[in-house]
From Swiss-Prot:
Its main location: membrane. InterPro entries: Na+/H+_antiporter_NhaB. One of its GO terms (molecular function) is sodium:proton antiporter activity. This is Na(+)/H(+) antiporter NhaB. It is a multi-pass membrane protein. It is found in: Cell inner membrane. GO terms for cellular component: plasma membrane. The gene is nhaB.
Length: 512
């Protein structure tokens, strides 16, 4: 019997999301206009809290849908205007171009990245060295590429290796990777160990993207927003953030080493010998079948990667345009000429790009309703040294439960407003920009909500295969969260100001 129109409409609304989630969103949409009539300031904060809720519930429904509905309503009832949203999008066009073109460009270099991580996994036998290598490789790549793409590549490697062993162990050429029923007891034990091994590697790589992503203006989308607000190029951004990012990187790598040595928090599991044998045999077969055309494609991707790093380091063009050049060069020299094949590169980035546009709509509400003005006034009443720590902590707290791009955008806008109003000087603003950048990037590893790369991992096809749940991810990230947050705070408090002053004294950094 066919369902009623009312039931069909309810099922269509937000699709497979739970009924309680749909009811909650409807309640938000009904309450907001009523509160806005009587208390616009309170309604603005309510909207921000609701939007953070949609980000936290990203596994129930992709935040673009509920967040977008909230943003549309905010414009309709007058919390902000379409013109203000357009201005915010225009101001942050470089970030949108970064996501559209850079992520798509790196898609055409996946073969090279897959080759790098495959060689690491099979050529290094020590789990500690392998973990450090994965963390280091992810950090280096994320400093120049998009963290989402780096994680996507590592996920591809892990799913590929998992599938190879699972098919051999279950003696099936086309089996369901979720189905373990055809495995005997011994093979199931080996598979469980392999899952634990992959979980630890994925978490090391995920944290590596945060360690590298904080260092450069292209490492994370919010970095570019902050760099533009401060007027920094690629080199200046790296130098200004270095007094915090470099010590944090060293301590992060040390944490990786200690976790593998102590075998705590789910780390330290070795790659089973039976799995290594299967993977090694498969790799030998694949390498022997690699054609000259495929080898040349790898070389071309390596050269394009060198061009990417060179162009970014010397700021030869806007980041998004460099990404566009990567798309053109990579497709031209690897033989990808079909429109549909090129189109696949954009499917990864465009949903998040659209979500970022919604972020900026919420930022427009925050600006028009002056929501953060009381917080900023409170922070600016503190001493200059304390301001840095407070900005870092406020950013870190919000970034651990919400998306760090959103948080970074909000706080750098407020700091810029304080600069323009004369509440702070240019030197203090630049120090605050570093505190905001590190505050949004480092503590956000606490939960998948804060880091887009972590959320991407949690919602990927790999997560259920290796039994990586939300709770387990938070638990495995905990030691990194504590170390990165505390070391970052100490560096902001004690090393940032003297290091920056020293760079200015010797003429490496110019006073603005």
């Amino acid at each position: 019997m066919e369902i009623s129109y009312g039931r069909a409409l309810w099922r269509n609304f937000l699709g497979q999301s739970p009924d309680w989630y749909k009811l909650t969103l409807l309640a938000f949409l009904i309450i907001n206009p009523l509160v806005f009539i009587f208390q616009p300031f309170m309604a603005g904060w309510l909207l921000v809290a609701e939007f953070i809720f949609t980000l936290a519930m990203a596994l129930k429904c992709y935040p673009l849908l509920p967040g977008g509905l909230l943003a549309i309503e905010a414009v309709v009832i007058g919390m902000t205007s379409a013109e203000r949203v357009k201005d915010e999008l225009a101001t942050n066009l470089e970030v949108l171009l970064l996501l559209m073109f850079m992520v798509a460009g790196i898609y055409f270099m996946k073969q090279l990245l897959l080759f790098i991580f495959t060689r690491l996994l099979l050529s290094i036998r020590s789990k500690t060295v392998l973990s450090l290598s994965f963390c280091l490789a992810a950090a280096f790549l994320s400093a120049f590429l998009d963290a989402l793409t780096v994680v996507a590549v590592v996920i591809s490697v892990a799913i590929g290796f998992y599938g190879i062993y699972h098919r051999v162990a279950s003696s099936s050429s086309d089996n369901d990777l979720q189905d373990d029923s055809q495995l005997d007891v011994n093979k199931r034990d080996v598979l469980e160990q392999f899952r634990a091994f992959l979980r630890s590697l994925m978490m090391h790589a995920g944290v590596g993207t945060a360690l590298g992503g904080v260092m450069t203006m292209v490492g994370e989308p919010q970095n570019l927003i902050i760099a533009k607000a401060a007027g920094w190029n690629f080199t200046e951004f790296f130098l200004r953030v270095a007094p915090v990012s470099v010590p944090v990187f060293i301590c992060g790598m040390l944490t990786c080493f200690l976790l593998e040595r102590t075998k705590t928090f789910g780390y330290g599991v070795q790659l089973p010998g039976a799995v290594r044998d299967v993977l090694h045999e498969f790799d030998l077969k694949s390498r022997s079948q690699r054609t000259r055309q495929e080898k040349l494609a790898l070389i071309a991707q390596g050269i394009i990667g060198a061009w990417l790093i060179f162009a970014l380091a010397f700021h030869l063009a806007e980041v998004g345009l460099i990404g566009l050049s990567v798309i053109i060069l990579a497709t031209s020299f690897t033989g990808v000429t079909d429109e549909h094949a090129i189109g696949k590169a954009f499917t990864e980035a465009l949903p998040f790009t659209a979500l970022l546009a919604v972020f900026f709509a919420i930022v427009a509400v925050i600006i028009d309703q002056q929501l953060f003005t009381p917080i900023i006034h409170f922070v600016l009443q503190a001493s200059p040294d304390s301001q840095l720590s407070l900005f870092y902590l406020f950013n870190g707290l919000l970034s651990s439960i919400s998306d760090n791009v959103f948080v970074g955008s909000v706080y750098i806008n407020e700091a810029k407003t304080a600069l323009e109003s004369g509440a702070i000087g240019i030197n203090q603003f630049e120090l605050l920009a570093v505190a905001i950048n590190t505050g949004t990037n480092l503590p956000s590893v606490a939960t998948p909500n804060g880091q887009a790369a972590f959320l991407f991992l949690l919602t990927s096809a790999l997560a259920p295969l290796i039994r990586l749940s939300y709770g387990r991810m938070v638990w495995m990230a905990l030691p990194y969260t504590v170390v990165l947050t505390l070391v970052g705070l100490l560096c902001v408090k004690f090393t940032l100001i003297p290091y920056t002053q020293w760079l200015m004294q010797i003429g490496i950094l110019a006073a603005h």
